[in-house]
């Protein structure tokens, strides 16, 4: 039996086992997916511990996505640029790090038939969640990428390696019509479901609204967007997509789209 798992600090609410167990079943993989709750005292020994336990692959969540990078032998290009690893492969005694949030975001937009190349994207929030999204938009030839932050100068220092523009929320109020608005802030996430990062006036200026929050599935941001005729994309398929990509890395397989859809539909019932 192959051993896999999720590494983090507080993991009681994780949906990851359901994603991975479905992939195991549909692809006849004899696998076991565990939750590994790691205390901060042991954060410097994560990769070594995985090797000792015979773990073949692991997902990594907060607060260890950055800390684990120093412990890896090889890190993928996208993970280096993003500055975070959320997937580890142990193979032939070596450890490899990837960022599958990058691929999960891409899968989510592809499924929703949102074209990136030649279009403009405004990204709300300058936290860690924005990095994989900015990198994917850059690599996919978006015409214009604008990061919207409460502190524009701080955001510029933090994201200066990206070929993007910067804007304050006040400046966002004055823009003309654009293509897509992406929320990477925790606004609207349970239990603060009544919060939204931008005004309805701003939302009306876009054609597409994307929210990486998936609890609830339809945030106040997406509800406002839908009511104003925008195409809306919820964040649940990004979660599914990043998990599926991890499985493809670990097991050298190509997961069928029907499996992805079944996982999405099963998880959707939770919210």
UniProtKB/Swiss-Prot annotation:
Sites where the protein binds NADP(+): 125-129, 212, 235
Cross-referenced InterPro entries: Aminoacid_DH-like_N_sf (IPR046346), NAD(P)-bd_dom_sf (IPR036291), Shikimate_DH (IPR011342), Shikimate_DH-bd_N (IPR013708), Shikimate_DH_fam (IPR022893), Shikm_DH/Glu-tRNA_Rdtase (IPR006151)
Single Gene Ontology BP annotation: amino acid biosynthetic process
Listed GO CC annotations: cytosol
Gene3D superfamilies: Leucine Dehydrogenase, chain A, domain 1, NAD(P)-binding Rossmann-like Domain
Pathway per the UniProt entry: Metabolic intermediate biosynthesis; chorismate biosynthesis; chorismate from D-erythrose 4-phosphate and phosphoenolpyruvate: step 4/7
N-terminal signal peptide: none
GO terms for MF: NADP binding; shikimate 3-dehydrogenase (NADP+) activity
Active site: 65 (proton acceptor)
Catalytic activity: shikimate + NADP(+) = 3-dehydroshikimate + NADPH + H(+)
Binding site for shikimate: 14-16, 61, 86, 101, 214
EC number annotated for this UniProt entry: 1.1.1.25
Class of this enzyme: oxidoreductase
Summary of the function given for this chain in its UniProt record: Involved in the biosynthesis of the chorismate, which leads to the biosynthesis of aromatic amino acids. Catalyzes the reversible NADPH linked reduction of 3-dehydroshikimate (DHSA) to yield shikimate (SA).
Protein family membership: Belongs to the shikimate dehydrogenase family.
Protein name: Shikimate dehydrogenase (NADP(+))
Gene coding for it: aroE
């Amino acid at each position: 039996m192959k051993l896999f798992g999720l590494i983090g600090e507080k993991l009681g609410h994780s949906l990851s086992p359901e994603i991975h167990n479905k992939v195991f079943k549909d692809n006849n993989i004899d696998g076991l997916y565990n939750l590994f709750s790691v205390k901060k005292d042991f954060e410097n020994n994560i990769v070594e511990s995985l090797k000792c336990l015979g773990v073949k692959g692991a997902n990594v969540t907060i607060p260890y996505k950055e800390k684990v990078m120093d412990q890896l032998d090889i890190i993928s290009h996208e993970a280096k640029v993003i500055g975070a690893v959320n997937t580890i492969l142990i193979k032939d005694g070596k450890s490899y790090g990837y960022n599958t949030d990058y691929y999960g975001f891409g899968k989510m937009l592809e499924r929703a038939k949102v074209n990136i190349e030649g279009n403009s994207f405004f990204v709300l929030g300058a936290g860690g969640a924005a990095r994989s999204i900015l990198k994917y938009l850059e690599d996919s030839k978006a015409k214009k990428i604008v990061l919207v932050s409460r502190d524009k100068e701080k955001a510029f220092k933090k994201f200066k390696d990206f070929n993007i523009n910067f804007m304050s929320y006040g400046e966002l109020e004055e823009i003309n019509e654009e293509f897509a608005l992406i929320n990477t802030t925790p606004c609207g996430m349970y239990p603060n479901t009544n919060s939204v990062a931008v005004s309805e006036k701003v939302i009306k200026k876009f054609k597409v609204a994307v929210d990486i929050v998936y609890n609830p599935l339809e945030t106040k941001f997406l509800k406002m967007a839908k009511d104003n005729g925008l195409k809306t994309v919820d964040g649940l398929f990004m979660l599914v997509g990043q998990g599926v990509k991890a499985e493809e890395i670990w097991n050298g397989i190509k997961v069928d789209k029907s499996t992805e859809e079944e996982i999405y539909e099963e998880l959707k019932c939770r919210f």
